[in-house]
């Protein structure tokens, strides 16, 4: 359950924001754990009056808002509170301030976050019913014991509702009062009593949210301690501004700090850790403890202010309720005027200055003893710039920013860093002069300006400390004070932007920071220093006094400017020469980098001519950074050499602001030129100091201090610049050009730093010389830059304007602004030199060189010789670097002014080296330019080549793609064309259609005829087949009859022969001879017949004999015209049975002869002989000896006929081989195949189907088929076929061709293509698939 806040809680919304938002590292943590609602109830019960609650609440607010990054700071704050007599009250008020008057959302968050803290801090609160309520309220959300505390909560809620209504009413009344008061008075931007809208106007755009929150806080806290503001404006402003800048978003910090001295003391104490850390670092380099003394003085002043505030708060205890306390105008309550306070400050600063001078005389020796930082190794130069710089800036920025809201702090510091990097002359003077205009830009400025303000208070405090401390300590305090100055500067800038009336007062606070200088300067400053106080208490009538003092200051400044102009030329020349000599002595080694010294000399000469292009020697970075406000200028000067430089810068700042205020006309007339010149120098100095800070060279205390301070100072410088820019924009007095010039300068310095080659062995020495010169020059230039800080230089804009205008305006402004009274602080020569350095714009001086030089120059304190020659250098923080340079030069501090001779020698040497360096420089520049041009040309060529290659590849790819596409198109078109042609061919023309029709008709007719013929042929074939069968049967029957009749005939013949034998013996003999012949043939045939009978016809013997005898008869027929008569008698010889034959043989044998080899020869009566061989072979020889028959044992039979024919029968193959006397050989195979081998080698083969094949000796073959087809095979394998229909075919390995009788030729190739040539000349070609490839019609 969330409880609605009361009016006290609404007012405490500011505190809530501070508690909740102040420190980015501790974001979301509420430092004061008191629950505002419960506390409000508690306060009612405790009847705490306004006087007690108000300062307490203020202290609590400051305490809760403490700007500390670490818990130690919180502890320190607690210590401060414990020291604070009003601590119990603060504890009471803590609860109220814990939760600011925020919207419901923030309140809810506060309620959530508060419970835990409330329980933790129960003991801290006064034990009463309110504490019990607190415990219940906080335990409820944490432990969820709502049942136990319901009653208490209900009561509390009712009370809270009542209180809330009352407080809201009171708040509205207070706001109305504040509005009325504000309408009559110009309030500070951070402390604006205006409503949210108006207060936001004075805030930066990023602060709008916090502005709303702040408005709630302002009514209750604004001007709680006017006495404190009056009495210690500079210190309080510094702390308040620093805190305010830290919480730039909230703007509550300033109000809270002002609310009570406790707040202020706590704020100081919060800043103290940072400053103490800086002091510690400074003490490392500077054994003296002046900074500590300064701090003590500041704390004492703060305590006094707190006492005054407490008194006033006691007086203001009229209000019964904390939230109802009236907001009284601080002006009426002031008991001490700002002029009085300035007088006191001036006295303190004079004392500190004296002490510093004494310590400076003592300090250089120990400082001189410190080892010189060795040259940077490769890669360390830029790395040290960037890394160290970023580290220091980050660390210090974080310190400054922690009090600011995280969101605002980050952008502010980012802007600061960027701006610091740029060459910018701070516009603090312009801001002071243009405060009425600044109000317009107050929003933008509050961010950057807030940082600057916080830095300014630090600078003021540091300036006080510096006056007490030696140069080293001054530098240390300068670092610490940088944050204060920044705070002050931010605060003052905001005040100036919000308070047009305080325009004159703005320079006065700047003087307040610088009051430590001279009384004369302090007098000038009095109006300036009163500025911050008057800003804080803008309502006081002191403004009029300030304005009067400002007018007087303007007159004095104008006089100083005139003096400066007169002495400028001479002083510039002398100062430059002296600085060069000092650097030369400090950096004895001269190398190619020593050309920087020559460069500086040239630049000095160019400055006189108005062509100074670089601000390297003029490096018054602190001035640059702080020119926006003299305090900020002091911070930068402190950054340079927080000792003398702080003094000088403070003094310079005051006069500068005075000048800017008093001589607003002059600033208007000369601001552009002067500011340009000063900004050049300041921007250069800033760059040097920034570089030095980044480098963090431990050799010189000033370097280390400046490093730390640079982080701080750089931030304010950017803020101051922003303020200056805004003020310039707002005020016609400020040159618009200057704002951009600032940033541009920083950029140029950066560029120069980058351009410088830190690796050069002598760059460090050159840089140190340059730096020393720059520091010396920058000290005056700082003052001038403070006056000219309004001028900002953009790198884009030419420095020629500065050079032209710097000679005049820079001299005047430099004298006045630098010293307030240039004669007082600086000798005329030095002032001239400073202005000269400002004019000088060392164009290419790189940041690295500036850094290294600044390191070297910073490391040793300014030598006494330098102080003797140029007393103005002593107070300036840059003088520390100069002192370091003098130490390097081994010029003892005690050396009398008689060292001018040595300085002259050094000058001559430097001039000689300068000429040489210039030569190297020119050559190097030309070479670098040529190299750059060559590299650019090569790069361009490479790019062109790469582009050409790429274009070529693309073009080739495109051409190839186009080619492929065209090929695909062609293929498609070809396919389409082929299809078209094929389709066209498939459609015959009219003539062809007629022919086709005619042919079809003829084919139909022929088919019909063929069918009829086939029918007829089939019938004829069947008829003939039946006839053949009948004939075969008849033939068989006839043969059977013949056999029977032959048997009968033989029987009858035998009987007749037996009868006649007895009668005719002689006839017998004749018959015997003939019978022998016939028997021989008959035997051979008979044996064959027997074999046939056994194999084929075992049941019949006659048919085989007949069939056996048939072949000889056929053979006879086949023989050429040979008669078959000899065969005919064989048939009757075959018929007699073997028995009969044996009987007949037995009867016919006349004799038998046995041979020794076992063969037996029988002689028959008819004269034939039979020889039987032992192996079964039988040989028969006819009576005439012409017919010989040999029957072999294997069944083969060989017959030699009377006509010399030889018939050989192969029993196994059943083949008959007949050889004729002329050489013809005829083979009869059992299958019916007949082969004839002619003597000439020709062979004729007749197959059973009556096909005749002729084989010619030359290899040709000819086959004649029964249908009349003739096939001829050539020796080459070609085959020619002639059909009976007149067609011819030719078969080769490549093709087959058919020729038709009508002349058409069709050829089929091996690949399947078909080509047809018609008699008309038409040619048609088809592929293997039958597709028509070509068809020509003639």
UniProtKB/Swiss-Prot annotation:
Start-end of Basic and acidic residues biased regions: 541-550, 635-650, 717-764
Processing and modification events after translation: Phosphorylation at Ser-589 and Ser-595 by PLK2 is required for procentriole formation and centriole elongation. Phosphorylation by PLK2 oscillates during the cell cycle: it increases at G1/S transition and decreases during the exit from mitosis. Phosphorylation at Ser-595 is also mediated by PLK4 but is not a critical step in PLK4 function in procentriole assembly.
Annotated GO CC locations: centriole; centrosome; ciliary basal body; cytoplasm; cytosol; gamma-tubulin small complex; microtubule; procentriole replication complex
Keyword Cytoplasm (UniProt): yes
Biased composition, class Polar residues, residue ranges: 400-409, 679-689
One GO molecular-function entry: protein kinase binding
Region Interaction with STIL: start-end pairs: 895-1338
Region (Alpha/beta-tubulin binding): 319-394
Principal subcellular localization: cytoplasm
Protein name: Centrosomal P4.1-associated protein
Species annotation: Homo sapiens
């Amino acid at each position: 359950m969330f409880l609605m806040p009361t009016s006290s809680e609404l007012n405490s919304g500011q505190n809530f924001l501070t508690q909740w938002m102040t420190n980015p590292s501790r974001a979301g943590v509420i430092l004061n754990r008191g629950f505002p609602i419960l506390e409000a109830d508690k306060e009612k019960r405790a009847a705490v009056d306004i006087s007690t609650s108000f300062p307490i609440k203020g202290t609590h607010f400051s305490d809760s808002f403490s700007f500390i990054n670490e818990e130690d700071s919180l502890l320190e704050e607690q210590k401060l509170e414990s020291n604070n007599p009003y601590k119990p009250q603060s504890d009471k008020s803590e609860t109220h301030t814990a939760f600011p008057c925020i919207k419901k959302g923030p309140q809810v968050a506060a309620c959530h976050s508060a419970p835990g803290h409330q329980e933790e801090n129960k003991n801290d609160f006064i034990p009463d019913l309110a504490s019990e309520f607190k415990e219940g309220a906080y335990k409820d959300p944490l432990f969820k014991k709502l049942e136990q505390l319901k009653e208490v909560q209900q009561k509390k809620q009712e009370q809270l509702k009542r209180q809330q209504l009352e407080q809201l009413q009171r708040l509205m009344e207070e706001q109305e009062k504040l509005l009325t008061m504000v309408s009559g008075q110009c309030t500070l931007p951070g402390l604006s009593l205006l409503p949210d809208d108006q207060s936001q106007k004075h805030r930066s755009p990023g602060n709008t949210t916090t502005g709303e929150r702040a408005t709630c806080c302002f009514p209750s806290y604004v001007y709680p301690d006017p006495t404190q503001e009056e009495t210690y404006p500079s210190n309080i402003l510094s702390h308040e501004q620093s805190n305010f800048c830290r919480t730039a978003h909230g703007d509550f910090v300033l109000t809270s700090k002002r609310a009570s001295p406790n707040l202020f003391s706590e704020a100081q104490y919060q800043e103290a850790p940072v400053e103490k850390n800086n002091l510690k670092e400074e003490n490392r380099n500077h054994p003296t403890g002046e900074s500590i003394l300064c701090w003590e003085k500041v704390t004492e002043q703060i305590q006094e202010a707190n006492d005054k505030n407490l008194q006033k708060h006691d007086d203001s205890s009229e209000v019964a309720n904390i939230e109802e306390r009236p907001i009284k105008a601080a002006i009426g309550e002031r008991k001490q005027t700002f002029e009085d306070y300035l007088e006191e400050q001036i006295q303190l600063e004079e004392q500190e200055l004296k002490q510093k001078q004494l310590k400076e005389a003592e300090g250089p020796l120990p400082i001189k003893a410190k080892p010189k930082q060795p040259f940077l190794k490769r890669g360390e130069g830029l790395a040290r710039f960037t890394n160290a710089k970023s580290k220091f800036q980050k660390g210090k920025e974080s310190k400054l920013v922690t009090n600011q809201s995280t969101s605002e702090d980050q952008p502010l510091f980012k802007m600061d860093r960027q701006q610091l990097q740029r060459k910018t002359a701070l516009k603090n003077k312009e801001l002071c002069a243009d405060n009425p205009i600044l109000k317009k830009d107050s929003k933008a400025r509050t961010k950057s300006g807030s940082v600057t303000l916080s830095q300014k208070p630090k600078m003021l405090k540091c300036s006080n400390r510096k006056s007490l401390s030696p140069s080293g300590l001054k530098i240390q305090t300068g670092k610490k004070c940088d944050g204060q100055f920044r705070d002050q500067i931010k605060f003052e800038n905001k005040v100036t932007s919000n308070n047009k009336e305080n325009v004159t007062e703005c320079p006065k606070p700047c003087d307040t920071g610088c009051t430590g200088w001279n009384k004369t300067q302090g007098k000038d400053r009095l109006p300036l220093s009163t500025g911050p106080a008057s800003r804080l208490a803008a309502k006081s009538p002191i403004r009029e006094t300030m304005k009067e003092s400002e007018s007087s200051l303007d007159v004095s400044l104008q006089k100083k400017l005139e003096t400066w102009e007169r002495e400028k030329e001479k002083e510039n020349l002398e100062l430059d020469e002296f600085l060069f000599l000092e650097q030369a002595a400090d950096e004895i080694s001269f190398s190619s980098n020593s050309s920087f010294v020559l460069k500086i000399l040239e630049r000095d000469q160019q400055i006189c001519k108005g062509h100074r292009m670089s601000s390297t020697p003029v490096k018054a970075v602190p001035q640059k950074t702080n020119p926006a406000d003299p305090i900020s200028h002091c911070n930068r000067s402190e950054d340079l050499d927080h000792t003398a430089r702080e003094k000088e810068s403070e003094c310079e700042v005051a006069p500068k602001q005075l000048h800017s205020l008093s001589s607003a006309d002059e600033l208007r007339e000369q601001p552009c030129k002067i500011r340009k010149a000063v900004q050049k120098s300041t921007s250069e100095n800033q760059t040097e100091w920034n570089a030095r800070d980044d480098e963090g060279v431990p050799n010189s205390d000033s370097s280390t201090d400046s490093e730390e301070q640079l982080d701080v100072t750089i931030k304010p410088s950017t803020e101051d610049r922003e303020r200056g820019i805004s003020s310039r924009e707002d005020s016609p007095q400020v040159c618009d050009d200057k704002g951009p010039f600032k940033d541009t300068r920083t950029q140029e310095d950066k560029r120069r730093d980058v351009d410088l080659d830190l690796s050069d062995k002598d760059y460090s020495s050159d840089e140190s010389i340059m730096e020393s010169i720059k520091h010396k020059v920058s000290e005056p230039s700082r003052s001038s830059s403070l006056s000219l800080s309004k001028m900002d230089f953009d790198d884009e804009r030419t420095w020629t304007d500065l050079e032209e205008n710097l000679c005049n305006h820079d001299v005047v402004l430099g004298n006045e602004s630098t010293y307030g009274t240039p004669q007082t602080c600086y000798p005329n020569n030095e002032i001239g030199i400073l202005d000269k350095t400002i004019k000088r714009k060392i164009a290419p001086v790189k940041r690295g060189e500036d850094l290294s030089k600044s390191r070297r120059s910073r490391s040793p304190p300014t030598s006494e010789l330098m102080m003797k020659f140029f007393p103005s250098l002593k107070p300036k923080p840059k003088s520390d670097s100069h002192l370091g340079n003098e130490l390097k030069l081994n010029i003892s501090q005690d050396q009398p002014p008689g060292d001018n001779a040595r300085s002259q020698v050094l000058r001559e040497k430097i001039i000689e080296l300068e000429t040489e360096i210039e030569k190297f420089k020119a050559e190097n520049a030309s070479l670098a330019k040529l190299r750059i041009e060559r590299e650019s040309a090569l790069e361009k060529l490479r790019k062109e080549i790469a582009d050409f290659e790429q274009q070529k590849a693309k073009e080739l790819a495109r051409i190839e793609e186009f080619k492929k596409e065209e090929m695909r198109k062609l293929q498609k078109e070809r396919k389409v064309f082929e299809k078209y042609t094929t389709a066209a061919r498939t459609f015959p023309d009219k003539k062809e259609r007629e022919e086709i029709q005619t042919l079809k008709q003829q084919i139909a007719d022929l088919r019909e005829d063929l069918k009829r013929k086939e029918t007829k042929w089939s019938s004829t074939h069947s008829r003939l087949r039946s006839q053949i069968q009948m004939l075969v049967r008849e033939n068989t029957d006839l043969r059977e009859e013949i056999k029977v009749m032959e048997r009968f005939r033989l029987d009858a013949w035998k009987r007749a022969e037996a009868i006649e034998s007895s009668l005719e013996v002689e006839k017998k003999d004749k018959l015997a001879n003939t019978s022998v012949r016939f028997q021989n043939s008959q035997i051979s045939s008979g044996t064959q017949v027997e074999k046939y009978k056994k194999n084929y016809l075992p049941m019949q013997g006659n048919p085989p004999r007949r069939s056996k005898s048939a072949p000889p008869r056929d053979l006879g027929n086949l023989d050429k015209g040979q008669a078959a008569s000899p065969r005919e008698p064989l048939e009757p010889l075959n018929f007699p049975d073997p028995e009969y034959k044996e009987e007949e043989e037995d009867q016919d044998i006349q004799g038998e002869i046995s041979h020794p080899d076992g063969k037996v020869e029988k002689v028959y009566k008819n004269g034939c002989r039979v020889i039987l061989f032992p192996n079964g072979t039988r040989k028969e020889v006819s009576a005439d000896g012409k017919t010989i028959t040999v029957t072999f044992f294997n069944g083969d039979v060989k017959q030699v006929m009377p006509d010399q024919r030889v018939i050989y029968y192969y029993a196994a193959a059943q083949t008959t081989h007949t050889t004729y006397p002329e050489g013809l050989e005829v083979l009869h195979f059992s299958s019916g195949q007949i082969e004839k081998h002619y003597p000439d080698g020709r062979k004729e083969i007749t197959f059973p189907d009556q096909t005749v094949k002729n084989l010619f000796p030359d290899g040709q073959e000819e086959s004649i088929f029964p249908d009349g087809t003739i096939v001829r095979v050539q020796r080459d394998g070609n085959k020619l076929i002639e059909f009976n229909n007149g067609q011819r075919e030719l078969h080769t390995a490549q093709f087959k061709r058919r020729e038709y009788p009508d002349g058409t030729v069709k050829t089929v190739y091996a690949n399947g293509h078909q080509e047809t040539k018609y008699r008309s000349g038409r040619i048609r070609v088809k592929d293997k698939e039958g597709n028509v490839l070509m068809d020509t019609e003639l």
